[in-house]
Amino acid sequence: MASRSASKDIITLRGSAAIVSEFFGYAANSILYNRAVYPEESFSKVKKYGLTMLLTQDEGVKNFIASLTSQLSEWLEAGKLQRIVLVIMSKATSEVLERWNFNIVTDAEVVEKGAIKEKSDKEIMREIQAIMRQIASCITYLPCLDEPCVFDVLAYTDTDVDAPGTWVESDAKLIDNPQMVKLHSFDTKIHKVDTLVSYKKDEWDEEE
């Protein structure tokens, strides 16, 4: 029994890439739901990370996120992904309103030498839970998005990466003088993910 439970603590590069890419898929869904980018009724509830999570039922968005997480997993396994940014923009003007940053630090030794690390599934899940709870409570610290919005995803990779044809070069979609909130991090011992949301200052704040 002891050896069976110990084996669950072993993290491989491929396993870590799967954890991080899956996390981003659920995080993206949660952001789109909690920021009301898509209607509440277009999401369904599922259990994940010991929490009730929301997943889009919009076929276009589902396919986009599925394709995205598959590509992210490939880049993560190659040690080539530095950051993922989910950008929320005004549908009418394309003005950037929020940038959800997921900064990734990869253990180079694991990529180069195939080393394995140890960390319990429960510990990783607890760290991810903390981030998901912060995303779910974002209405308490982010301004209301009172206009129709759209989203995009930026991936920052090493310069030697050949991106698939579905990806195009993009500007950074920055926000002038943004407000920032640092969220929790999680670490598989191979990939460390730091989370930060930056957002456009509310007009009321600017008048004060």
UniProtKB/Swiss-Prot annotation:
Compartments reported by the entry = Nucleus
Task: Specify one Pfam family.
Answer: HORMA
**Domain HORMA, first and last residues per copy:** 14-197
Q: One GO BP annotation here? A: mitotic spindle assembly checkpoint signaling
Is the keyword Cytoplasm assigned to this protein? no
Q: Which UniProt keywords apply?
A: Cell cycle, Cell division, Mitosis, Nucleus
Which SUPFAM superfamilies does the record associate with it? The spindle assembly checkpoint protein mad2
- Name the principal localization, coarsely classed: nucleus
Q: Which domain of life is it from?
A: Eukaryota
Q: Which GO terms describe its cellular component?
A: cytoplasm; kinetochore; nucleoplasm
Role according to the record:
Required for the execution of the mitotic checkpoint which monitors the process of kinetochore-spindle attachment and delays the onset of anaphase when this process is not complete. It inhibits the activity of the anaphase promoting complex by sequestering CDC20 until all chromosomes are aligned at the metaphase plate.
Please give the family membership noted in the entry.
Belongs to the MAD2 family.
Protein name (Swiss-Prot/TrEMBL): Mitotic spindle checkpoint protein MAD2
